[in-house]
């Protein structure tokens, strides 16, 4: 939501799930260094990533940029951004003075007004993403309905408690209910 694109993490996970089920080959990126983020969110995400290792991992991980004409470029102070400067790659391509590079560049680097440096808090998360990229091809999580109505989960993720889990009764009902992404509060009526 901090990128103001109208989606939540749960929506993104549901999309990964649906596209995986449909057999779509996914190519996507993961962004970090989003203005207004809570550094502790990276710790939480690093802990959760092993649970989704069966989904296609991002092909690239990169820092959010302030591109020309973007809100981060046009209204940097509103997002706690300062010191906008042309991306360092422009210096290698165009041997021009700073003023000319500033007018020419489309991609910009920046600092955060509060002094934060995301490089100092994303390392465990980056390690978890790399582990995801390494483990993905060996990990599956699938469900099959049995003739007796039970649901059998087959799980080869490294975090799996066991290879197969048989769900029936309330466990099966909860699993099926959660097939469409749900929030914890949505589960109250099962209590």
What is each stretch, according to the model?
Residues 165-191:
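Long, charge-rich, low-complexity alpha-helical segments
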């Amino acid at each position: 939501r901090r990128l103001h694109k109208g989606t939540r993490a749960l929506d993104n996970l549901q999309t990964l799930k649906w596209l995986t089920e449909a057999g779509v080959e996914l190519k996507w990126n993961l962004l970090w260094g989003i203005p207004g983020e809570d550094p502790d969110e990276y710790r939480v995400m690093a802990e959760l990533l092993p649970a989704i290792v069966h989904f296609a991992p991002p092909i690239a991980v990169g820092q959010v940029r302030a591109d020309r004409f973007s809100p981060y470029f046009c209204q940097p102070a509103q997002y706690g951004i300062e010191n906008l400067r042309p991306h360092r790659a422009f210096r290698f391509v165009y041997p021009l003075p700073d003023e000319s590079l500033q007018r020419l560049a489309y991609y910009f680097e920046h600092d955060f007004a509060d002094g934060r440096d995301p490089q100092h808090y994303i390392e465990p998360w980056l390690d978890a993403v790399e582990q995801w990229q390494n483990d993905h091809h060996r990990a599956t999580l699938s469900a099959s309905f049995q003739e007796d109505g039970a649901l059998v989960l087959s799980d080869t993720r490294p975090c799996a408690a066991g290879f197969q889990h048989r769900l029936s009764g309330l466990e099966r009902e909860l699993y099926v209910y959660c097939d469409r992404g749900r929030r914890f509060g949505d589960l109250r009526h099962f209590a």
